[in-house]
């Protein structure tokens, strides 16, 4: 297979808002969800073989209740800091989303999948189509 023919897709929760605190709260569930995969890695590989930033962010995790999987406001996300939320999700005003998507494009990403489970799915999709993708 020709490696140059491979396309890269990225996926993340996203929320467009000038209110950064609100945006973070709407997507904090995503890094909490990802923490399940991080815990799997920690259980499979020696801690020293993993990036410190990866295992450090789950140190204060106290389990995960799948009854509240991918749920805005879930207690599953109590341990997730603003810094981790910012690194795992795309949050902030339209300009911040454009910048993140441009950075992903420059890194070779050809498709971006927005996880919209945020309670305002239609409004967020409309903003993405009108002001981010269509701009």
Sequence positions of predicted segments:
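Flexible loop/turn segments at secondary-structure boundaries
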Residues: 17-18, 119-123
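Residues that line or immediately flank small-molecule/substrate-binding pockets and catalytic motifs
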Residues: 116
């Amino acid at each position: 297979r020709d490696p140059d023919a491979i396309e890269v897709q990225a996926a993340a929760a996203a929320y467009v808002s000038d209110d950064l605190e609100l945006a973070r709260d709407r997507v904090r569930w995503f890094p909490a969800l990802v923490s399940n995969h991080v815990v799997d890695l920690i259980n499979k590989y020696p801690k020293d073989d993993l990036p410190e930033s990866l295992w450090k962010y789950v140190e204060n995790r106290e389990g995960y209740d799948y009854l509240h999987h991918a749920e805005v406001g879930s207690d599953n996300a109590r341990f997730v800091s603003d810094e981790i939320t910012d690194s795992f999700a795309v949050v902030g005003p339209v300009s911040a989303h454009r910048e993140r998507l441009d950075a992903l494009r420059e890194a070779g990403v050809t498709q971006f999948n927005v996880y919209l489970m945020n309670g305002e799915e239609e409004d967020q999709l409309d903003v993405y189509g009108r002001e981010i993708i269509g701009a």
